[in-house]
């Protein structure tokens, strides 16, 4: 990470969120939904369940005490050995600092530790920066795997080399 890690007073800390982080998780998700125009939104009960999920998780990057970015991993029961990356979001004032890369590193390592074979994700054509990040990380096109009406791109990555 660039400036926010080099000599800055604002320490970056990434945590696997729990129920004590619920307000920050809902705040980041709300901003993401509005920015991207998400139609299928996670319910409050769904977010709470994910925060307690052992086979998935929700990570928040904090800069100082400010929640700056998030990502979630949730099981894909219809695809054995797979989970789905969702809601990668970095607040505008923290973009370009490597937070998305750090969150994806943690998510992918967690998926590998769970013994999963694949991480899937969907996106929209207009999220070009995110799509480029995914492709640089080795995500490759795959068949549609869900019924998300807004998704136009479907990618997956093997978790084991």
What is each of the regions a protein language model found here?
Residues 2-86, 91-92, 104-106, 110, ...:
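Acetyl-CoA-dependent GNAT
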Residues 22, 97, 128:
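Loop/helix-junction capping segments adjacent to catalytic residues or to phosphate/diphosphate-binding pockets
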Residues 91-93, 97, 125:
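Active-site acidic-Proline motif in GNAT/NAT acetyltransferases
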Residues 97, 101, 105:
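Residues forming the Rossmann-fold NAD(P)(H) cofactor-binding site
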Residues 101, 113, 125-143, 148-151:
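Conserved active-site alpha-helix within GNAT-family acetyltransferase domains
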Residues 104, 111-123:
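Conserved GNAT acetyl-CoA-binding A-motif
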Residues 153-159:
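Short, basic/aromatic-enriched C-terminal tail that caps enzymatic domains
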């Amino acid at each position: 990470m660039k400036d926010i890690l080099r000599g800055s007073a604002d320490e970056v800390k990434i945590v696997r969120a729990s129920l004590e982080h619920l307000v920050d998780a809902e705040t980041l998700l709300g901003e993401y939904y509005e920015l991207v125009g998400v139609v299928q939104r996670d319910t409050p009960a769904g977010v709470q369940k994910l925060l307690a999920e052992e086979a998935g998780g929700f990570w928040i990057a904090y800069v100082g005490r400010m929640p700056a970015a998030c990502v979630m991993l949730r099981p894909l029961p219809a695809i054995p050995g797979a989970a789905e990356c969702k809601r990668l979001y970095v607040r505008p004032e923290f973009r370009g600092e490597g937070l998305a890369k750090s969150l994806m590193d943690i998510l992918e390592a967690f998926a590998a530790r769970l013994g999963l074979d694949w991480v899937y994700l969907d996106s929209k054509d207009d999220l070009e920066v995110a799509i480029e990040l995914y492709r640089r990380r080795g995500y490759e096109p795959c068949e549609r795997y869900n019924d998300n009406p807004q998704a136009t791109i479907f990618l997956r990555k093997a978790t084991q080399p």
